[in-house]
Amino acid sequence: MAITAQLVKELRQKTGAGMMDCKKALTETDGDIDKAIDLLREKGIAKAAKKADRIAAEGLTLIKTDGNTGVILEVNSETDFVAKNEGFQSLLNELADHLLAAKPATIEEAHASKMENGSTVEEHITSAIAKIGEKITLRRFSVITKEDNAAFGSYLHMGGRIGVLAVLNGTTDEELARDIAMHVAAVNPKYISRDQVSEEEANREREVLTQQALQEGKPENIVAKMVEGRLNKFFEEICLLDQAFVKNPDEKVKQVVAAKNASIQTYVRYEVGEGIEKRQDNFAEEVMSQVKK
């Protein structure tokens, strides 16, 4: 039987599954739409599609390293309860192992890449959604490489609510690298050093501080000096090397790193759900939405 566009459209409307999944299911069932629906349900595709419009803002981060390669990833679920589920934890580890080995460059490339079991990452996640019963997404990941004379530092806070992977060059001291990662988790700097702050951002802050000083009635001849002092505090807030080290506030991070003749190559910090707008459902509306299903 010929698979028409109308038939594919009808199956999409009934299941919410993607066009190619619908076309494939119809082909396999010789155009029988009821059997195609059952097939999509069996594969978990219809179930996953129905959850696609939900918001997944909970979840966990995870970090794995192997030799000179490291990966940090964030996988989201709808609830914190599911994030603690054994099936979710297994999925998180499987994805981390795969990303570490495959080293895809983008989320799209990651989704399309084949895992050891022969399924793509996207299919593997879809299968997990069918078993676990919540929307799950691989939100982001970073694959980082280092030289032999360098150290990875990884730190997970609150069981993975915040994850940081840092790289220190010029040293193989993993304990120091972990301390730097812990500092980044706690303080959340925007930059490694002040030379990474754009001139535009620095000038904007300088202008704000100048206006504040003038409004405080400070004499113009000392405003410039005051502004530079306050600008240094601004850099201390946003630049890792200028910050007081969390384990010893009497020292700056740059002093701690320099003592080992090391430098900070990079760091990646993920906090679960940051930047995702969580939907606030009213309880009555939630009940009605369940009744209507």
Curated annotation (Swiss-Prot):
Q: Which GO terms describe its cellular component?
A: cytoplasm
Region Involved in Mg(2+) ion dislocation from EF-Tu, residue ranges: 79-82
Gene Ontology MF terms: translation elongation factor activity
Q: Which PROSITE patterns match?
A: EF_TS_1, EF_TS_2
Q: Any idea where this protein resides?
A: Cytoplasm
Which InterPro entries would you find in this protein's record? EF-Ts_dimer_sf, Transl_elong_EFTs/EF1B, Transl_elong_EFTs/EF1B_dimer, Transl_elong_Ts_CS, UBA-like_sf
HAMAP family the record matches:
EF_Ts (MF_00050)
PANTHER family, per database record: ELONGATION FACTOR TS (PTHR11741), ELONGATION FACTOR TS, MITOCHONDRIAL (PTHR11741:SF0)
Q: What is the role of the protein in this entry?
A: Associates with the EF-Tu.GDP complex and induces the exchange of GDP to GTP. It remains bound to the aminoacyl-tRNA.EF-Tu.GTP complex up to the GTP hydrolysis stage on the ribosome.
Family to which this protein belongs: Belongs to the EF-Ts family.
* Protein known as: Elongation factor Ts
Gene encoding the protein = tsf
